[in-house]
Regions:
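GNAT-family acyltransferases
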Residues: 2-126, 137-138, 142-172
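ATP-dependent phospho-/nucleotidyl transfer catalytic cores
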Residues: 131
């Protein structure tokens, strides 16, 4: 999934001296940096969750037509953005690291009133058990406690995508 900020900010997304959280671990799952080494498990999670992903990220056709090669390119992009501190993609894995359960994206936003936007998804097979709601709750708490943001948007979670898209830009 390619999550792009609408426009680069003249200020860094996070302060230069901010220590980026390595991840989050609960009794159920672990978040850690998404890397190219996750491609096989990530690809399987994405393609088996395609219908759900089109609901989580409306208005597009992703991940229709995604190949493992394209997923590898996407993961490399996310990994490089993480290293450059311009956005942060975390894979959500089981504690044994045997399965990818979803992803969390912490991104800059150009929306006035917000200094970050967080997007997340859980694999379709885990929805009935409530994983996505538990993941969202844990991530919101983690962001509030560990990250330097004052105001975070969660499009599609407490704020409709349509509402988020209509927010004025910081540039206007």
């Amino acid at each position: 999934m390619q999550i792009e900020s609408a426009a680069p900010s003249p200020a860094p997304f996070v302060p230069d001296d901010f220590q980026i959280p390595a991840g989050l671990e609960t009794a159920e799952f672990r978040l850690r940096m998404l890397t190219v080494n996750d491609v096989v498990k990530d690809f399987e999670a994405v393609v088996t969750s395609a219908e759900h992903l089109k609901q989580v990220f409306p208005g597009g056709t992703w991940p229709d037509g995604l190949t493992m090669e394209q997923d590898l390119i996407d993961l490399g992009w996310h990994q490089k953005e993480f290293q450059r501190r311009t956005s942060f993609a975390y894979t959500v894995v089981t504690l044994s690291e045997s399965r990818v359960l979803g992803c969390v994206y912490v991104c800059p936003t150009d929306k006035r009133g917000y200094d970050a936007a967080v997007f997340l998804w859980a694999r379709q097979s885990e929805l009935a058990g409530g994983l996505e709601e538990r993941l969202a709750g844990a991530v919101k708490q983690w962001i509030a406690q560990e990250w330097p943001f004052r105001s975070v948007a969660y499009p599609g979670r407490g704020m409709a995508w349509e509402e988020y898209e209509k927010l004025p830009s910081k540039k206007r």
